[in-house]
Design a protein with these regions (language model features):
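A mobile, often basic/glycine-rich helix-loop segment
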Residues: 213-215
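Non-catalytic, mostly N-terminal accessory regions of nucleic-acid modification and defense proteins
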Residues: 1-112, 175, 179, 183-189
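Conserved S-adenosyl-L-methionine
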Residues: 90-203, 208-210
Length: 215
């Protein structure tokens, strides 16, 4: 208990440092997307004063809860795209250009009730575009259909832990997934039959990561 944002804002100095570290550890033990996002996360700050400035002076001054998922999600997508364009980071191999994704999703035209998978999901672009397509083209979905769309319709696999973490955050900010359903799995989707079947498969096969699996 007590590992939340208000508790961080109240702390300062070494006490803040310790509480921040314990908060990261606790979040990493959670189920669902939160656990994946914060799994093995570490405090990279060396100076407690800088951490406090980030928490109190920058982040806490914004009213994040009043922002829609579209605003927060689009901002995060923009950061992912900017990072992918940095050739030194090597992140481009996990980020498919959004216009290409949109063209493929438009061609597949997913519908409410269908299950959609990306066996090499990277930062989650195909899954998010498929979600947006269904929402846009089927505005009269029932509450049950909307709940199923957000909570049960998407599943992605990502081999690289750090990239899976980026994808999980992307999904969370867009309101997809839940504590009961984890839409992102860390692992090689070709290593074994996952035992699941899907109506639609959208993917851009990875070319930047070697695997022991041969096809």
């Amino acid at each position: 208990a007590g590992y939340d944002w208000p508790s961080l804002v109240k702390k300062d100095g070494d006490e803040l440092f310790d509480h921040y570290r314990h908060t990261l550890e606790e979040l990493g033990r959670q189920k669902g997307l939160l656990g994946l996002i914060f799994n093995k996360s570490q405090n990279k700050f060396q100076d407690p004063a800088k951490l406090r400035r980030l928490i109190v002076d920058l982040i806490d001054k914004e009213t994040w809860v009043s922002m829609s998922a579209d605003v927060k999600g689009d901002a995060y997508e923009g950061l992912l795209e900017k990072n992918a364009q940095d050739t030194k980071s090597g992140a481009g191999q996990y980020f498919t250009p959004r216009p290409l994704i949109q063209a493929i999703v438009d061609a597949m035209a997913p519908t409410p009730g269908e299950t959609i998978s990306d066996p090499a999901c990277g930062t989650g672009g195909f899954l998010l575009a498929a979600h947006d397509y269904v929402v846009k083209h089927y505005p009269n979905m029932t509450s049950a259909e909307k709940k199923k769309l957000r909570g049960e319709s998407f599943k992605g696999w990502e081999l690289v832990q750090a990239t899976a973490r980026l994808c999980a955050m992307n999904m969370l900010l867009h309101g997809i997934g839940s504590q009961e359903f984890e839409p992102i799995a860390v692992g090689d989707s070709l290593a074994a039959d996952p035992g699941e079947r899907f109506d639609v498969v959208l993917t851009n096969p990875p070319f930047g990561k070697k695997s022991s699996t041969t096809i």
